[in-house]
């Protein structure tokens, strides 16, 4: 009988150690943003540059990644990550509606509106209205379309996080050089949309921010940009992982700094 009790005590002790270890591991995963099994992130413009690297990092952390591309057949790198690749043109309402139908009622924990374009116009005389309109359509109206269409999915999600990728040159307070016609305006309007969104959805537990990724060495940023895609995305992940309700409606950089509107 004594031997039986001793054996039972050993089993009980082993079970306690196992439970404690499992809880500790789960806590660590959650802290690191993994808590992966039920987490889904949707990234627009995920076939290259910052969007592709974000997809790579979140997939590696165990998240289910939904990456959009205008031409999904060409998104081979994105598909190789194990991401779910979906066709999306953010300027086409029918395409956005198609995305919403494809998702159905699936919860989305985080939406990253990353798709964007920059068509350089330095002086007023150089402004081409069609190019100006194009930047507004992609950089401003596009995120509005996508966020509105996916709001039911985001409401069903756990994290309820909306990250709109902006630029430091969208800051009105810091504009001391002019230029970048169309691009500045499109991103400044995105900032205002995000601030209004934060005020509306904050009471529901949402965190809505705009985030400047830095001047990054991508097709858009060019070869002279000082920041690699990996450096930018590592910073973004750290910022996003540390967000709290106090950050709702803020303008942040990839380094975690707050910017003036």
How would you name each of these model-derived features?
Residues 61-76:
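Conserved glycine-rich Rossmann-like NAD(P)H-binding loop of the short-chain dehydrogenase/reductase
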Residues 91-106:
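Conserved Rossmann-fold cofactor-binding substructure of NAD(P)-dependent oxidoreductases
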Residues 203, 210-213, 222-261:
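C-terminal helical subdomain
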Residues 44, 108-116, 139, 164, ...:
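Rossmann-fold scaffold of SDR-type NAD(P)-dependent oxidoreductases
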Residues 57, 61, 105-106, 118-122, ...:
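A short helix-coil junction within the Rossmann-fold of NAD(P)-dependent oxidoreductases
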Residues 47, 51-56:
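N-terminal Rossmann NAD(P)H-binding glycine-rich loop of SDR-like oxidoreductase domains
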Residues 117, 125-136, 141-144, 155-202:
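Catalytic loop of short-chain dehydrogenase/reductase
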Residues 80-94:
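Rossmann-fold cofactor-recognition segment
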